[in-house]
Amino acid sequence: MAIAATISMCLINQKGGCGKSSTCFHLAGALAATGHRLLLVDADPQGSISQAFFGSDAVERFTPWETLAGLFDDECDSISSGTLIRSTHIEGIHVLPANQFLATYNAPSPERAGVMQFALRDFLEPLTAFDVVLIDCPPNLYQCSWNAMLPGASH
């Protein structure tokens, strides 16, 4: 079942342990079971969504350029969706993973913050392979959360 335009939603709350990652994980499963194509964006440096799909050991071995952190790194200006987005064992669900490297970019210096604020929106905008984009946010309102709110506001 295809949706006319991609729907982007971020699950955000300034409190940890309130179920953002669990809700994102289970909502993705339910939507995939009904035939929707999902992209889960793990915007939390804890990488809970990434660990749920790929395991802790694998997630710890990802380089910054294999995770959401690559969008914020000046050295990765030509990074592609094929490099960042990973398929999972569940049909219809793909993940843009995160790990500890994302913490470096969650609270950038003031001169970098302006350049970084549209990175995720600009990355997601041309993607047409997904019906729904779910973004799991960290328990704060720093850079990763602001980035997560922009794609939903533009749809």
Which sequence ranges carry the predicted segments?
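P-loop NTP-binding core
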Residues: 1-155
